[in-house]
Design a protein with these regions (language model features):
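A donor-sugar binding/catalytic signature common to diverse glycosyltransferases
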Residues: 85-89, 114, 238-281
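Glycosyltransferase specificity loop/lid
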Residues: 1-81
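Active-site-proximal region of nucleotide-activated glycan assembly enzymes
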Residues: 103-173
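Leloir-type glycosyltransferase catalytic cores
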Residues: 129-152, 287-327
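Active-site donor-nucleotide binding/catalytic segment of nucleotide-sugar enzymes
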Residues: 5-18, 125-126, 131, 157-161, ...
Length: 327
């Protein structure tokens, strides 16, 4: 039986991506173990290795393999002896895979930063050069080294399914994000809908100004006057509400923007500028007119209500499990 190690990166989209991957893996003839950070660990998901233990407490941005914790992780992965490592551009697990000469696939939306050929005319660098460079050249070079030593580099993004997808460099492939098409339903019809994992205060404040608005969140029991908060773990209700809303709002996570695209909904992003992936997604999505970036809660939404996008599928693009099935 094929043994897989899936390693989630240290960001919020990695949590959504991991949860949906594991859902698809249910009942398949594979053994799957998971390495993840606290930030990327879905509720109720069994985590075999919590990667926060490998971080420097005082300088978490400094990633080093010269530690007892890393050596222990290496030994345990070696004992598990996976046939395939799937990494969401996760540094430590990628290093272990290379040391063990294990087949390594990168599957991450963060690969947008490396894979797209023409990325200098979308405003990403002119407007956000500080964010792009604040983690310094060593971090970027570290990621490039990982990509050069991976067997496949999959760009996890719905942009590959658009009618005119951005061109990718050699050695990169699009991978389709997991999603569901919601059903048309009168009870699911609401005005504005938002998806957020952390109860983003700006999004909460914005939606309070618009009647019949609903927020899907990991913290649905927090009391918010004038808002409906629902559990994002209920994916059936989440996608039903998304399919039938007038407008979708999020922070720019890949999975949320992909959900809106495949359900034909226009998006607004109140971008999380602490997360480079959210910034990249927001910029590229706005550039190809799938969404708009909103900066202030005082901005109005009336001109965006009811806008739609043309969802599409590129027959050449597959889901990650379809690649696994070919092994």
């Amino acid at each position: 039986m094929l043994k897989i190690l899936y390693a989630a990166s240290n960001n919020e989209n990695a949590k959504i991506q991991l949860a949906r991957f594991m859902k698809v893996m249910e009942g398949k003839p594979y053994i799957v173990k998971v390495a993840a950070y606290l930030k990327s660990s879905p509720k109720g998901q069994s985590i075999d290795w919590t990667l926060d233990a490998l971080l420097n407490i005082f300088r978490p941005e400094v990633l080093t393999t010269e530690s007892d914790a890393f050596n222990t992780y290496y030994d345990q992965v070696k004992y598990y002896n996976p046939d395939l490592v799937i990494s969401d551009l996760e540094h430590f697990t990628s290093q272990v895979a290379n040391l063990l000469n294990t087949t390594l696939w990168q599957c991450s939306s963060s690969l947008l930063n490396f894979a797209i050929e023409q990325k200098y005319n979308v405003g990403l660098f002119s407007k956000y050069s500080y964010l792009m460079n604040k983690n310094n050249a060593s971090r970027t070079q570290r990621q490039i080294n990982i990509l050069e030593n991976s067997n496949y580099n999959f760009v996890y993004s719905h942009l590959g399914d658009t009618t005119s997808p951005p061109s990718l460099k050699n050695n990169y492939d699009w991978i389709r994000p997991y999603h569901t098409i919601g059903k048309d339903s009168v009870p699911c019809r609401h005005n504005v809908m938002a998806g957020t994992l952390t109860n983003n205060r700006k999004i909460l404040s914005l939606l309070k100004k618009y009647g019949d608005s609903v927020i899907f969140t990991e913290h649905p029991y927090e009391q918010q006057s004038g808002l409906w908060l629902k559990d994002i773990q209920n994916q059936e209700e989440y996608f039903c509400n998304l399919k039938n809303c007038n407008l979708f709002v999020c922070e720019g996570q890949t999975s949320f923007l992909a959900d809106a695209f495949y359900n034909g909904k226009y998006s607004l992003t109140m971008t999380n500028f602490q997360d480079l992936e959210c910034v990249m997604n927001s910029i590229f999505s706005e550039h190809i007119k799938l969404s708009s970036m909103l900066y202030q809660t005082e901005d109005t939404l009336e001109s965006f209500l009811g806008q739609t996008v043309a969802s599409s599928y590129n027959e050449k693009i597959r889901y990650i499990h379809e690649w696994i099935e070919e092994i």
